[in-house]
Amino acid sequence: MKSIIHFSIFLLCITGPFVALSQGITEGAKVTGNIQIDGQYYTENETLGITDSSLNYRKTGMNGFANLLYTNGNFSAGMRMESYLNPMLGFDSRYEGVGVPYWFARYKTGSFEMTAGHFYEQFGSGLVLRSWENWALGYDNNLYGFNTSFSPIDGITLKGLIGIQRYFWEPYEIGNRGIVKGFDADFDLNEIFEKMADCQTRIDIGGSFVSKYEKVPKVTYVVDSKYFIDSVEWNKQTVYELKLPNNVGSWAARVNISNGGLNFYSEYAEKSNDPNATNGQIYKKGTALYSSLAYSTKGLGVFLSTKWIDNMSFKSKITETGTPPMLDINYLPAISKEHQYSLAALYPYATQPNGEFGFQGQIDYKIRKGTALGGKYGTSLTLNYSLAKSIKKDTVAISPITNSWVGTQGYKTNFLSIGDLKYYTDVNFLIDKKFSNKWKGTFGYFNQSYNKNVIEEGIYNENNMVKANIAVVDLTYRFTPSKSFRLETQGLWTKEDKGDWLSMLLEYNISPTWFFAISDEYNYGNPSDDLKIHYYNVAMGYTQNTTRFALRYGLQREGLLCVGGVCRYVPASTGLTLTITSTF
């Protein structure tokens, strides 16, 4: 309620002068928005362990939001209302409630722009700062404060910001999270220097500095020691305080070079010592490097990316942990491919901020139509490979005070070193083929290695490596331009974890209004006969103009939902789900 009042007062103060000087606030104004409501009704399922007790005696869950955006010339303002009554399964219970966690007022004049209120921002690739939101993940780390952007001359863009991060509904107080400050400068050399204006090679360089101030909690350790005086044993207790930094700074430098279909990007970042709950309270500085190379021409696309990160968890609260990770100031770009097919996405990768080497390569090739392999319509091929491994670490001696690595450098490592421990690999190959005006299909093969201990438990060994092979056949038959039928079959085979899976989906579409679907994921290879479960679902949807209703009933298997290397655990559930979306 306070957020709504604050937004209303601020909006009136900002817009008041404009109203007085114009014919009215509605002249030239535009109002847009969108709404989404996700509701669930849960039923018990003894096999999946879903009981009234596990549901906390709540039969329903509802997540919803409404965005409203007002624009008038150089001025814009917006707000988002959210409701979690109760939060759906898998979402943090601290979201429960109703309020306005996001509102802003923005004004732009010439080359200057200022935002007051809540905002999202990213410097470079996000290695030192990225504030973003993903509704499906239940993730939102928007900043509340001021954000400015200024271009003194063509080709130079300067940004500055200060704010606090959203933390569910918790109001900011000194000590419950830190204050984030940042500055970014971007230089387009082709625009700055007249001699480079017509050069085919485009060069852009930039740099960022981000810091956080946090009133950190006091952490002490008591060490007992014994000594003798006149053959009498005495005990002595010495209290040591862990000196935690109130200010933590980070910086990054980047370059982007492009020429025609060739594009190279690289960014290097460092973070000062930042002992926190994620790294085990060690004092080693953080380092990160992210680079990508892309090439595209007619019929061919190649993309390569790599990253090396060491101790780069950067939060505005040093004690914060959890999945998904809240209060992250920065973002470590994902290196693995996000798959659209459910069994291929059964084992997704989650970024490891304490140390990771990653590589991804992808080739997209279009076989020309009229050839033996291309056929009448041509054929699209995609080959993708991704790898994540540890970095080499040589641990230092433990502290005699804490009897652990707390309070030490933790370990030593060489920049760009690669360790022996494998976190994740994924090799996949997709074929997209149109056979006729009525038939088209997608055929895929995936080979994955998934270190369950590392990704899910934070245990760094290979004692629980899941190796899986997945195959996909996805066929679509179009009866008329508006009516189609789709058959999707998937198989996953592994000797580890929950064993083999088989999935099938039947979908009928009447575009653009109706869809009907029935699906089943069968865990027929589960080592436990009681858990060889059919995860069946029936669904339908209706669309009218910009409003869509979707209804689904069935079982949801447990697992991780990941977007960009950030993951949320989704528990098993059974029941009815209704989703309503609308835009205006």
Regions found by a protein language model. Name each.
Residues M1-T32, T583-F584:
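Bacterial Sec-dependent N-terminal signal peptides
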Residues G24-K30, Q36, Y41-G61, T71, ...:
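Signature for the C-terminal beta-barrel architecture of outer-membrane proteins
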Residues G64-L68:
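Histidine-anchored nucleotide/phosphate-binding helix
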Residues N72, Y107-T109, N259, Q544:
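Structural motif
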Residues A105-L127, S131, W135-T148, P152:
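Well-ordered mid-protein domain cores that form the structural environment of catalytic cofactors
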Residues A539-F549, G554-Q556, V570:
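Long, ordered, helix-rich scaffold segments
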